Amino acid sequence: MNRIDERLAALKAAGRKALIPFITAGDPEPDMTVSLMHALVRGGADVIELGIPFSDPMADGPVIQRASERALARGMTLARVLEMVAGFRRTDPDTPVVLMGYLNPVEAMGYAAFASAARAAGVDGVLTVDCPPEESDEYAQVLQSHGLATVFLVAPTTPAARLAAVARLARGYVYYVSIKGVTGAATLDVADVARQVGALREHLSLPVGVGFGIRDAETARAIGEVADAVVIGSRLVQEIEAAGAQAPDRLQALLAGIRQALDA
């Protein structure tokens, strides 16, 4: 078991739901990322999803696109993201970290080199948005051989063949995309999410995290009733964009309110 498995199993045993926040590495400033990660933990994060900035983030809405642009403009690279995780690990050996991003930077580094460097930095899992599960056997094998969980997205439109590949290759948890479209879009239908997550559980034994469209404590609590984990990203990145130097304190306060609602 890696840190993700241990944390999610402990939460399940305690009857609690996991809170998984997302931020983009290097936004608003590279020097602030590790402080933001610690602020998320103080606010109640169980797992941190750390976004790898990318020039063409096709699955992301305007808020996270702008975050990627800001981070890239400040010189962020995949290697620097790994340095940030290593910096976080110097004072937090326990909170699981999942890298979320696109395949191109990983391919540029090489699967094995990336997996080795990620593991050495203290990464626990990798979610590669544009890597189809049914084409991911080699990639998943390399990551898993280095002790990294392979997290995959599933959606209401995921076909049976792809779902079968996810069931075979996924580790850690599965990220259910609760609405069609890009991150930060639309309003989700909690009743529909409940039906879809119930159907997913017939095929998957891993914990199910739900993301896309969760913007406040009330929605997070409702999703927590039907899922194992609540993933929140665009709302936090929006807060970072508005808060500037106050981002760590603002993020901690925002997440603490969501944590309180989940535990109510």
Curated annotation (Swiss-Prot):
Substrates-to-products reaction catalysed: (1S,2R)-1-C-(indol-3-yl)glycerol 3-phosphate + L-serine = D-glyceraldehyde 3-phosphate + L-tryptophan + H2O
This protein's UniProt keywords: Amino-acid biosynthesis, Aromatic amino acid biosynthesis, Lyase, Tryptophan biosynthesis
Lyase as UniProt keyword: yes
Uppermost EC category: lyase
A GO-annotated cellular component: cytosol
Listed CDD domains: Tryptophan_synthase_alpha
This enzyme's EC code(s): 4.2.1.20
One family name in Pfam for this protein: Trp_syntA
InterPro entries in alphabetical order: Aldolase_TIM (IPR013785), RibuloseP-bd_barrel (IPR011060), Trp_synthase_alpha_AS (IPR018204), Trp_synthase_suA (IPR002028)
Record has Amino-acid biosynthesis as a keyword: yes
Biological or metabolic pathway of the protein: Amino-acid biosynthesis; L-tryptophan biosynthesis; L-tryptophan from chorismate: step 5/5
Gene Ontology MF terms: tryptophan synthase activity
Active-site residues from the entry: 49, 60
Record note on quaternary structure: Tetramer of two alpha and two beta chains.
Family matches, as PANTHER family: TRYPTOPHAN SYNTHASE ALPHA CHAIN, CHLOROPLASTIC, TRYPTOPHAN SYNTHASE, ALPHA CHAIN
Function: The alpha subunit is responsible for the aldol cleavage of indoleglycerol phosphate to indole and glyceraldehyde 3-phosphate.
Family as reported in the entry's similarity comment: Belongs to the TrpA family.
Name of the protein described by the UniProt record: Tryptophan synthase alpha chain
UniProt gene name: trpA
